[in-house]
């Protein structure tokens, strides 16, 4: 998907109302839990799609109604790959939204129904009008119904505190995702995608829109390192289908309030933060067949944004990830450049969008500031310092795991001895 496609995704955002979508879903899907409760419908934030939260009338089920943008709707193989990945992860025990079959899909599933050339028994197409002056009077948009994962997004807030433990837990969860995806493949994910980290050199064309000379120079240094450090290993890096966008907006967490005892016994009666643990993964719009190491590089980049210690927070995510899905020595050595590559892609594309949308430029450029700050922190630290620090964080995590195992074994030994004493 090119930068032109990225722009078209925004231009081809579905033009519909919640009532339009609910009526269409009622006509094409039968939901567990009964009919949709009209009073429950809430539109959710989305960059270029339309998403609606709904609850059934009996209150037992929650869903997301998703209307895809026009660009994605014309890529049935990609839609099929997204569905297949969600079902694969669900079967592997990873909490993800699961597509609900259309009524037509349920009827024809036994004979292997095909829709528009690919398996797509969970997609229906809603015809929507286009603005006056368009080449065509209407456009078909793909509609899905997805099961809902309860929780909150992992974006940092008063309730979701990014402690080292939380970041390691996020990394461990994403390591589970990566491990589950080793056995997954779908031809629909084999595509050229601008947001595939392996294609970051294509972003060079859009980096010309970066107005600040120092930021432009910073971006060019990343492109140079990518050419000289990463590309010589391109043919030998492990490859597979990746979710490719595990940022703090796409990880779902469960927040637990601290117990009264925890608050009472807190040192100095300080405030005890709520505990958050990752419980789900959202958004499969960017899936792509790429280098497996990109999965963690992308997450490290996003969880470093807006932080006092971007390098350290990224290292905590990495330590958790490698405890579940170890990287090779080469993959680990390339991480500083790959993390920087995702940050450059985000910042350069943001600058390009601002240049194309002058009325919204101030806001778009403001949102890029955390990205530039994180990128500068990684580049100022240097590859060797980043790698040395991350290795230390991984060792500390392993030392903690050994200690916990020792404590657990000691507790088990005490229980066994107690049983022996009582048996005398």
Task: Name every feature range the model reports, one short phrase each.
Residues 1-37:
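Juxta-kinase regulatory segment immediately upstream of eukaryotic protein kinase catalytic domains
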Residues 3-5, 9-10, 208-209, 346-424:
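ATP/Mg2+ or Mg2+-diphosphate-binding catalytic cores
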Residues 31-55:
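ATP-binding glycine-rich phosphate-binding loop
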Residues 47-64, 99, 227-294, 408-424:
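Active-site acidic catalytic loop and adjacent metal/ATP-binding pocket
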Residues 57-185:
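ATP-binding pocket architecture of kinase catalytic cores
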Residues 70, 105, 139, 143-160, ...:
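A glycine-centered beta->alpha junction motif in the catalytic cores
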Residues 157-217, 237-239, 265, 365:
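A cross-family kinase active-site recognition segment
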Residues 292-326, 341-358:
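Active-site activation/catalytic loop segments of kinase-like enzymes and analogous catalytic loops
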């Amino acid at each position: 998907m090119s930068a032109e496609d990225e722009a078209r995704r925004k231009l081809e955002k579905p033009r519909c109302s919640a009532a339009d979508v609910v009526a269409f879903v009622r006509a094409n899907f039968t939901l567990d839990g009964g009919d949709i409760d009209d009073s429950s419908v809430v539109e959710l934030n989305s960059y270029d799609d339309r998403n609606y939260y709904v609850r059934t009338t009996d209150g037992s089920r929650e869903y997301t109604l998703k209307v895809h943008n026009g660009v994605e709707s014309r890529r049935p193989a990609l839609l099929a790959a997204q569905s297949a990945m969600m079902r694969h992860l669900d079967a592997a025990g990873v909490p993800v939204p699961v597509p609900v079959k259309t009524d037509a899909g349920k009827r024809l599933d036994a004979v292997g129904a095909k829709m528009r050339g690919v398996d797509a028994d969970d997609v229906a197409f809603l015809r929507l009008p286009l603005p006056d002056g368009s080449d065509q009077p209407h456009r078909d948009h793909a509609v899905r119904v997805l099961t809902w994962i309860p929780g909150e997004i992992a974006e940092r807030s008063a309730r979701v505190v990014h402690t080292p433990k939380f970041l390691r837990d996020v990394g461990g969860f994403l390591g589970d995702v990566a491990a589950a995806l080793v056995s997954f493949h779908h031809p629909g994910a084999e595509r050229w995608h601008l947001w595939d980290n392996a294609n970051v050199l294509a972003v060079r064309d859009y980096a010309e829109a970066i107005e600040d000379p120092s930021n432009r120079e910073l971006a060019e240094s990343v492109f140079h390192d990518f050419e000289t450090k990463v590309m010589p290993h391109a043919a030998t890096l492990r490859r597979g289908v990746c979710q490719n966008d595990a940022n703090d907006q796409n990880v779902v967490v469960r927040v637990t309030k601290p117990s009264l005892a925890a608050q009472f016994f807190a040192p100095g009666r300080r405030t005890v933060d709520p505990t958050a643990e990752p419980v789900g993964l959202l958004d499969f719009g960017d899936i792509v067949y790429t280098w497996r190491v990109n999965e963690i590089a992308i997450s490290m980049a996003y969880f470093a944004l807006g932080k006092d210690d971007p390098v350290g927070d990224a290292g905590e995510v990495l330590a958790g990830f490698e405890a579940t899905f170890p990287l090779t020595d080469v993959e680990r050595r390339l991480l500083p450049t790959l993390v920087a590559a995702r940050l450059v892609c985000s910042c350069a594309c943001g600058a390009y969008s601002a240049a194309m949308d002058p009325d919204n430029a101030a806001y778009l450029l403001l949102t890029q500031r955390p990205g530039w700050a994180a990128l500068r922190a990684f580049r100022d630290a240097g590859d060797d310092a980043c790698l040395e620090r991350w290795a230390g964080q991984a060792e500390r995590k392993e030392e903690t795991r050994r200690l916990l195992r020792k404590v657990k074994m000691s507790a088990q030994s005490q229980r066994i001895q107690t049983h022996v004493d009582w048996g005398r």
